[in-house]
Amino acid sequence: MRLDKWLWHARFFKTRTLAARYVEKSRCRIDGRAVEKPHAAVAPGMVLTFALGPRVKVVRIVALGERRGPAPEARTLYEEIDSP
């Protein structure tokens, strides 16, 4: 699944377009490697690091999701890891 689509499914961004713009302009990391393209592939087990407001989020992808569901369903797509 594309990174921007997963970020939208997991409800970190309100629209997929916002998620894509964020990935292009910000520093996201997948398993410690910098990513600049929103079409970067993600899979369960990968660790995603990105800044969201003043905080740095570090999450492990647990599932990809079939649709953008309600917030409780979105929280099942990832588990938060303490940031370094």
How should each PLM-predicted stretch be described?
Residues M1-P44:
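A basic, amphipathic helix-loop patch mediating RNA/tRNA/ribosome contacts
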Residues P54-P84:
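C-terminal structural segments of small proteins and small subunits
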